[in-house]
């Protein structure tokens, strides 16, 4: 633990000189920017200093410098194709690839032969859902998922519906957690797959994965979980939890973008129809040359996560508690979305009544935040996840997601809280609805008319 603290302090010290001129607090992780051409896409040092601090780690995490160190040799010196079997260049890359496979497997309690490398969680989800459904389509045409899944899961299910499959979209309770009795009732004789995410990407709610796995196992059907937001953050064991397929994303656990993995159980064997044709790499499940530097980075990220999970979780929990308590203490009419107990602390979703979320995001220009999933945040529609848990439209529009991660500092949390409190108060002062509430008017009693 002392080594970890020392490493992080050294990381902060190395960047403090460049940041002294900035009013924004020192970030937990900042890369040194070298000189570059005038028209380069790389930001200048001045631009880098003025960048907002990062509080959106649920969208993506910064690359851990130790992961980059592991990747660099395979970007520069060991560039062989891992599928070339006739010379040392291929053997070196293949050995690195298999070591990475072992590192990923170890993190989730799997056999390395059950790990298939992909381009990320979206591809893994597509392989799991479409692959299982299509393989068993001759006798099983029904799937079960939830209304709060990631968009790529929901869109995969809708795609299968267009092919003639039936899909049950389970509602969730106000807490964001599914009712296990409703799950059991939804299972039909021809159900092939149940897909429920481990940790929700917008509200951080943890589903009862072990209980779901037990239900699926007893009913002899396959269980898939999108664990992109959970792997490396909370303990997961695919055997204890009876998980048959699991999706993993590299850039959600301080690894590189463009790489992920899917766990597919071997015993009893889960049969999956491959989505693409080619050279038959990855046991025929995912044809195409495996990018050695990226999978090495994924493996290193998984190994670090396994070593530091407990430390990170305790530290993130304290920072999350600090953020929530300070905001709740200083601002009335703030609602935390999702179950506060069955919840991953690094994902905090708060609704600020009588404030438009987009206006608050624009005001908080010194802090990188989001109003929900990065995959759907461009939409002006309220979050479908918040609608699914019964949040009214006004509160859904006023939600902000705060992401706390490995490199988030106490100073950053305090700065974010300070700015948030200031701008919420300022925006509320401009709100006629807030003024009416302060005058004791019950907004629900008002009958609004359209002009």
From Swiss-Prot:
The modification Cysteine persulfide is found at residue 375. N-gluconoylated. GO terms for cellular component: centrosome; cytoplasm; cytosol; mitochondrial [2Fe-2S] assembly complex; mitochondrial matrix; mitochondrion; nucleus. Keywords: Cytoplasm, Cytoskeleton, Iron, Iron-sulfur, Metal-binding, Mitochondrion, Molybdenum cofactor biosynthesis, Nucleus, Pyridoxal phosphate, Transferase, Transit peptide, Zinc. Its cofactor is pyridoxal 5'-phosphate. It comes from the Eukaryota. Disulfide bonds: none annotated. The modification N6-(pyridoxal phosphate)lysine is found at residue 252. This is Cysteine desulfurase. It comes from Rattus norvegicus (Rat).
């Amino acid at each position: 633990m002392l080594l970890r603290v020392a490493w992080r302090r050294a990381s902060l010290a190395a960047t403090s000189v460049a940041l002294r001129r900035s009013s924004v607090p020192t970030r937990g992780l900042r890369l040194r920017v070298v000189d570059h051409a005038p028209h380069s896409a790389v930001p200048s040092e001045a631009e880098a200093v003025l960048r907002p601090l990062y509080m959106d780690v649920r969208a993506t995490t910064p690359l851990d410098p130790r992961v980059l160190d592991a990747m660099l040799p395979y970007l520069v010196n060991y560039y062989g194709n891992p599928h070339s079997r006739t010379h040392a260049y291929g053997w070196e890359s293949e050995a690195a690839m298999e070591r990475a496979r072992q590192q990923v497997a170890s993190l989730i309690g799997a056999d390395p032969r059950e790990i298939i490398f992909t381009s990320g969680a979206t591809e893994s989800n597509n392989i799991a859902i479409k692959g299982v459904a299509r393989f068993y389509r001759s006798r099983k045409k029904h799937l079960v998922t939830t209304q709060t899944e990631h968009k790529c899961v929901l869109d995969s299910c809708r795609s299968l519906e267009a092919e003639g499959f039936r899909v049950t979209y389970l509602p969730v309770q106000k807490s964001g957690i599914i009712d296990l009795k409703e799950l059991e009732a939804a299972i039909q004789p021809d159900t092939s797959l149940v897909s429920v995410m481990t940790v929700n990407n917008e509200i951080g709610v943890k589903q009862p994965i072990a209980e779901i796995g037990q239900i699926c196992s007893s009913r002899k059907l396959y269980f898939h979980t999108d664990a992109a937001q959970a792997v490396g953050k909370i303990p997961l064991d695919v055997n204890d939890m009876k998980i048959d397929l699991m999706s993993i994303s590299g850039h959600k656990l301080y690894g590189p973008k463009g790489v992920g993995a899917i766990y597919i159980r071997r015993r009893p064997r889960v049969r999956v129809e491959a989505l693409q044709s080619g050279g038959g790499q990855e046991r025929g499940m995912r044809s195409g040359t495996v990018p050695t530097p990226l999978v090495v980075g994924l493996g290193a990220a998984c190994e670090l996560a396994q070593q530091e999970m407990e430390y990170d979780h305790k530290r993130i929990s304290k920072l999350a508690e600090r953020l929530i308590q300070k905001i709740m203490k200083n601002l009335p009419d703030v609602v935390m979305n999702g179950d506060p107990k069955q919840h991953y602390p690094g994902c905090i979703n708060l609704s600020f009544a009588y404030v438009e979320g987009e206006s608050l995001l624009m005001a908080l220009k010194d802090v990188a935040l989001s109003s929900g999933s990065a995959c759907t945040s461009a939409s002006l529609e309220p979050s479908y996840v918040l609608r699914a848990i019964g949040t009214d439209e006004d509160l859904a529009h006023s939600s902000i997601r705060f992401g706390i991660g490995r490199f988030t500092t106490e100073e950053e949390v305090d700065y974010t809280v300070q700015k948030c409190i200031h701008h919420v108060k300022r925006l509320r002062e401009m709100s006629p609805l807030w003024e009416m509430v302060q005058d004791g008017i019950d907004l629900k009693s008002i009958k609004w008319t359209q002009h």
